[in-house]
Each structure stands twice: as C-alpha cells, then as structure tokens.
Amino acid sequence: MTWAQTIVDALKEHEISLIAYVPDSSIHQVTKIVDKDEYFHLVSATREEEALGIAAGAYATGRNAAVFMQSSGFGNSINAVAGLAIPSRIPIPIFINLRGEHGEFNIAQVTMGRSTRPILDVLGIPHYTLDSEERLEEKVNGALKLCYASREPLALCMTPLLHGGKNV
C-alpha cells in the first residue's frame, strides 16, 4: 500500500468525507485517490484560507473535513486558523506538504518551509511529521483521533522523504 492510500484509508476510518485542498503535485497523490472514491467530496480551493473556511462550514453541518495545502500556503491561512478554527474549537486535520526541506530546488520555499512548525508551536497547534511509511498508519490514525477528541485543529506535516518531493 502506498503512503497516499494509507492516508486515504485513515480519513475514511475517521469518517472524514470532505477534502478541501489547494492543488499541488505532491498532494495530488492523495487527491487522485480521493477523487475516484464516491465516499469523498473533493473541493478544490483557490486559497488555503478558503479551504479552511470550507472545512469549518462542513463541521458546522455535522460533516468531518480535512484540508491539504503546501507550507507556503499555510502562511496565507494563519488568520483563518487563529481567528476561526482555534477559538471556535473546530477540529480540522491540516495536511501540510512541507517545502523548503530535503532536496528543495526553489529558494523561495525555504523560509516558510522552515517556519511552519515553529508557527504551529506558537499557535499551540499539535503537529506531527510524516517523513516515512514506517508507522505511518499509526501516526495518522493517532493524530486524527486526537484532533477530534480535543476539538482543535491539528497539523500533519508531510516531508519530501515521505512523498518524494518536487523536481521542478
């Protein structure tokens, strides 16, 4: 089983049926599986804060949702997380494709990639690094369980060591 299928299976196990995302080639490995599965409703957002708003709206109607974005887009979404998801206690699993890490070719991605986890710490958002397929199922399921039990956003940071990164 691929790392992407492991994540999709965990989403289903936790009854997460709406996936809001901003397109990205690494995230596409997950969204292409989700798009073929009738269980899921896949929503492509134009900006990361829009994806978070979609997930918050889904939660308000009783539906579990997850968000997928790049670390650079996480920088765009901080106000939606700090001003909506955290104070409203909305459990949103945020899968962040970390750029600026191992093998990064684009210098513009480095600063936000390095800053993502410290920003998550400052906001008090629990986060877990997904950097290999070893124990991936355990990590993702444990994080999703905590997200919904604590009723707060939580980040799962996916590194190039997990998904292979980008070449161009």
Per-range role (PLM):
Residues 1-168:
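Thiamine diphosphate
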